[in-house]
Amino acid sequence: ALSRSAVSDVQIESLEVRSGQCPGPLYLHTSPEFMMKRMLADSWPDIYSISRVFRDDEWGPRHQPEFTLLEWYRLDFGLGDIVDDAVRLIATALVVDYRDAFLSVLALDPASASIRDMSAAANADADLVAAIGTERDDWLDLMMSTRIAPQFAKDCLTVVRHYPASQAALARTCPVDASVADRFEVFIGDMELGNGYVELTDAEEQS
């Protein structure tokens, strides 16, 4: 599918294409998410899609710019229901909060750790510190991918839930703790298999 607009998630790069029949750039869809949300807004029931999607800057032994994505939506499901739904598709899983994973592996609280603390935990040299700068979420992503996820069991799933609100993407913040998002990711070993969240439907919060 082609769109005149790129995806709004800052963590995802849209693949740009051009057509002689259309002024300006077009973008291949990164997921069927926005079309499916239109269907939900039009009162469709539970829905799913299995489709080819495209993402730029996703090239390596674990990522390709084109891949097949399963995406589904359940009405009136909370975060726990969505986690159970995802896990039942694959296998049994260990569920851990994002903050607890950091505390367990690094003895760092992701909500309060300083950039200095995180760079020390990453054994970051001066070049890496300069490259990442002072963006907290970039440091947290580095910690997750290089220090925490490699500790996950390789023979079962690990579900990490309640990511920081700054990494909510299109998820709502947790009703009982606004510092975290109702969002999760599923890993086997250190490889992410999927993710999910409770939709943000509050227009004021989304703005």
Identify the meaning behind each predicted range.
Residues V96-D100:
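C-terminal domain-boundary segment and adjacent tail
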Residues G78, I82-V95:
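Acidic, low-complexity central loop/insert segments
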Residues A1-D42, D46-D81, L106-S207:
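A translation/RNA-centric and nucleic-acid-associated enzymatic feature enriched
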